[in-house]
């Protein structure tokens, strides 16, 4: 009897040891690596108690990629307008430098013609047009006053001076200037462009001379309205003489204004649209 009980006890121990060995050899789930291990044998009461106390934590294996911050786009820079004058684009009534150049050329021709006419006839520009002179300025013809004001404002660039003149590329100098290129005329050896003007004025110089002519014709008219004398008589030049007896300096000035008016200057005129 005692031997039977001993064998039974040994069998129970062997069974338990075998059972524990089988459980050890069983593959463990992946969650056991991250979650705390629980006892295999537990009662229902202990299960309820432990489940109420146990809280699982979620572990992220892969993190979401952080979004890159949006790139800041710099606002486009406002392009400056092409301005090259006294009042700038904001001033005046919309004249461009090309318009001013045209008005200046007309003023040069008019001023030169008035000087030549006064030198030959002895009459000022207003007397040649049979306009009343030798009166106060406020009694002058309104159209004549407008003409004076227009020339004065044009001479200082107040009519609008949008745009600018750009010079042509610099011609070669030194030995390159002295050598005549193949197929070119003798004009190239003198430093003059093949198809350009003979006179060495740029359009910016031409505009300056035109403004001087506008000032000259405006002040000569103002002086003649008040004094009754023409521009040459106010400067004590001899007038009413043949053309061959006119003062050489006066003839040079007349020829200069005529030639500057008809000879196109070098360079080109650019505006805001051409800059874009």
Curated annotation (Swiss-Prot):
Subcellular location: Plastid, Chloroplast thylakoid membrane
Sequence repeats: 62-168, 169-276
Annotated InterPro entries: Chloroa_b-bind
Gene Ontology cellular component list: chloroplast thylakoid membrane; photosystem II
Protein name: Photosystem II 22 kDa protein, chloroplastic
Topological category with respect to the lipid bilayer: Multi-pass membrane protein
Family stated for the protein in its record: Belongs to the ELIP/psbS family.
Presequence range in chain numbering: 1-67
Top-level division of the source organism's lineage: Eukaryota
Keyword Transmembrane: yes
One of the Pfam families matching this protein, by short name: Chloroa_b-bind
Residue ranges crossing the lipid bilayer per the database entry: 106-126, 140-160, 207-227, 242-262
Keyword annotations: Chloroplast, Membrane, Photosynthesis, Photosystem II, Plastid, Repeat, Thylakoid, Transit peptide, Transmembrane, Transmembrane helix
Function: Seems to be involved in non-photochemical quenching, a process maintains the balance between dissipation and utilization of light energy to minimize generation of oxidizing molecules, thereby protecting the plant against photo-oxidative damage.
GO biological process: photosynthesis
């Amino acid at each position: 009897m005692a031997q039977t009980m001993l064998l039974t006890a040994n069998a129970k121990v062997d069974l338990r040891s075998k059972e524990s060995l089988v459980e050890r050899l069983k593959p463990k789930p992946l969650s056991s690596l991250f979650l705390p291990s629980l006892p295999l044998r537990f009662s229902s009461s202990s299960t309820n108690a432990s489940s109420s106390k146990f809280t699982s934590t979620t572990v992220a294996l892969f993190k979401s990629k952080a979004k890159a911050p949006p790139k800041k786009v710099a606002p486009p820079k406002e392009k400056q307008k092409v301005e090259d004058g006294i009042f700038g684009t904001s001033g005046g009534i919309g004249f461009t430098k090309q318009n001013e150049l045209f008005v200046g050329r007309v003023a040069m021709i008019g001023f030169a013609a008035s000087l030549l006419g006064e030198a030959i006839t002895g009459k000022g520009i207003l007397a040649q047009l049979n306009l009343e002179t030798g009166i106060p300025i406020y009694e002058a013809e309104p159209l004549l006053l407008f003409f004076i004001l227009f020339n004065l404002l044009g001479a200082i660039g107040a009519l609008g001076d949008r745009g600018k003149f750009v010079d042509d590329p610099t011609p070669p100098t030194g030995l390159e200037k002295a050598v005549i290129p193949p197929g070119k005329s003798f004009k190239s050896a003198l430093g003059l462009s093949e198809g350009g003007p003979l006179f060495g004025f740029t359009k910016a110089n031409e505009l300056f001379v035109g403004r001087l002519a506008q000032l000259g014709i405006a002040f000569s008219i103002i002086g003649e309205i008040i004094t009754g004398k023409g521009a040459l008589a106010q400067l004590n030049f001899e007038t009413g003489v043949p053309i061959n007896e006119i003062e050489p300096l006066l003839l040079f000035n007349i020829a200069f204004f005529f030639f500057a008016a008809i000879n196109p200057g070098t360079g080109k005129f650019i505006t805001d649209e051409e800059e874009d």
